[in-house]
Swiss-Prot record:
It is found in: Secreted. Transmembrane segments: none annotated. Expressed by the venom gland. The lineage of its organism: Eukaryota, Metazoa, Chordata, Craniata, Vertebrata. Pfam families: Lectin_C. Heterodimer of subunits A and B; disulfide-linked. Anticoagulant protein which binds to the gamma-carboxyglutamic acid-domain regions of factor IX (F9) and factor X (F10) in the presence of calcium with a 1 to 1 stoichiometry. Also inhibits platelet aggregation by binding to platelet glycoprotein Ibalpha (GP1BA) and functioning as a blocker of von Willebrand factor (VWF). Is devoid of hemorrhagic and lethal activities. Possesses antithrombotic and thrombolytic activities. Also hydrolyzes the Aalpha-chain of fibrinogen (FGA). Does not affect the Bbeta-chain (FGB) and the gamma chain (FGG). Residues 24-146 form the C-type lectin domain. This is Snaclec agkisacutacin subunit B.
């Protein structure tokens, strides 16, 4: 009987430690480094995509990237599920080119693009960022902290 209780307790500890990782994201979202991500194949303008993301989950915004590994993770999510290779990301030019800002308010500490327009898309085929007219409609990726 004592062995059964010990094994049961051990399994409970393992289950509880695992439940704190991906279980923090809703079942149809993907987890990476404490954040949840979901691609949407519903072309919208940058502003409409950002608004849509904020309505999906508390704290959700268009995806921000803070490392090449994070950007690569999002590419693995979008490549099989989207019909296009361009997705809106949360970076936008504020104040006529003087200031770039992530829509979730996080610091711009990683960048990979050529500036031309006010909003950015990520090309999922080669993980390249491109500036694009904010009124163009594209698929997008939402992100929130788990």
């Amino acid at each position: 009987m004592g062995r059964f209780i010990f094994v049961s307790f051990g399994l409970l500890v393992v289950f509880l430690s695992l439940s704190g990782t991906a279980a923090d994201c809703p079942s149809d979202w993907s987890s990476y480094e404490g954040h949840c991500y979901k691609p949407f194949d519903e072309p919208k303008t940058w502003a409409d995509a950002e608004k849509f993301c904020t309505q999906q989950h508390k704290g959700s915004h268009l995806a921000s990237f803070h490392s090449s590994e994070e950007a690569d993770f999002v590419v693995t999510l979008t490549t099989p599920s989207l019909k296009t290779d361009l997705v809106w990301i949360g970076l936008k030019n504020i104040w006529n080119g003087c200031y770039w800002k992530w829509s979730d308010g996080t610091k711009l500490d990683y960048k990979d693009w050529r500036e031309q327009f006010e909003c950015l898309v990520s090309r999922t085929v080669n993980n390249e960022w491109l500036s694009m007219d904010c009124g163009t409609t594209c698929s997008f990726v939402c992100k929130f902290q788990a």
